Amino acid sequence: MSKLFVFDLDGVLIDSLPNMEHAWTSVRVKHEINVPFEDYKAQIGKPFPDIMRELGLYDRHLEIYETYKTHSRRCLDQIPLYDGVYDTLTELKNQGHKIALCTSKNRETVSLLEHKLPEFDYISCPKQGLRGKPAPDQLLFVMAFCNVDPIDTVYVGDMEFDQQAALRAGVHFEYAEWGFGDLVCDHSLKSITNLI
């Protein structure tokens, strides 16, 4: 039976942590912010405005985002895929499964990274009318678009917010052990290749 495999992007498919740290360092310098990267990292998985709210920087989130985006995009081509990602996603599609992306990255940035990955059946980025993770909205929208029920859906993520979104959407969650988070889960993957 075919399934829908939904993937988070950062920390699951791409190793973007060095890029994020570089961009956050630029933000700290330009905007004279004393929030360490570890505090930012703990919020990864949420939409950027929500991260800024958690860090007490929401009143400046638009200007901070512009700095972050500019410095992050300068190095996008240097962000590698994790080992086995391309082949695993391709094999899942070859087996007749659907694959989708559910990320907190904006669509414009994702479009600059898409060429590194196989074609997805759907890509969900934050959009008006849908709450970001840990709310289930994006996952529910992906399933509706792909015509797949929660029981036939697997969400692979690396952060607590991914796990919460999966639980709230009623889908099976697989924790990506190689990612940015530090979770204790009943179901985890040592490598993305464990999916095939």
Predicted segments — roles?
Residues 34, 98, 172:
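Residue-level detector of anion-binding/catalytic polar loops
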Residues 12, 103-105:
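Conserved phosphate-coupling serine/threonine residues in phosphotransfer and NTP-handling enzymes
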Residues 25, 49, 89, 140, ...:
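Short glycine-/small-residue-rich flexible loop motifs, especially phosphate/cofactor-binding loops
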Residues 9, 43, 98, 155, ...:
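Short glycine/serine/threonine-biased micro-segments
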Residues 2-86, 95:
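N-terminal helical cap/lid subdomain that shapes the substrate entry/recognition surface
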